[in-house]
Amino acid sequence: MSTAPTVTPERSNQTVRKTYPNYKVIVLNDDFNTFQHVAECLVKYIPGMTGDLAWDLTNQVHYEGQAIVWVGPQEPAELYHQQLRRAGLTMAPLEAA
């Protein structure tokens, strides 16, 4: 009685790493928040936000109806979104970038 040789599939030594998706934090225009309040909130809650960039984004919110104020991993995106919403800003739902 002969036995057939056993074939063992080769295992790949390469690890495939999937990156986590980024999310966009988007502020929407409204009729009750002042430019000053929006800009101050952006500087307060978005890391690395400068006053000049906050004013540019605030103008974009006003004239274009919305602005993407931060893009990055989901967990901090959820935090910044929640902080801005609690400060009274009108926020779009988080979107995958």
UniProtKB/Swiss-Prot annotation:
Gene3D superfamilies named in the record: 3.30.1390.10
Name of a matching Pfam family: ClpS
Gene Ontology terms: biological process: protein catabolic process; proteolysis
Family affiliation: Belongs to the ClpS family.
Its job: Involved in the modulation of the specificity of the ClpAP-mediated ATP-dependent protein degradation.
Oligomeric form and interacting partners: Binds to the N-terminal domain of the chaperone ClpA.
Protein name: ATP-dependent Clp protease adapter protein ClpS
Protein species of origin: Nostoc sp. (strain PCC 7120 / SAG 25.82 / UTEX 2576)
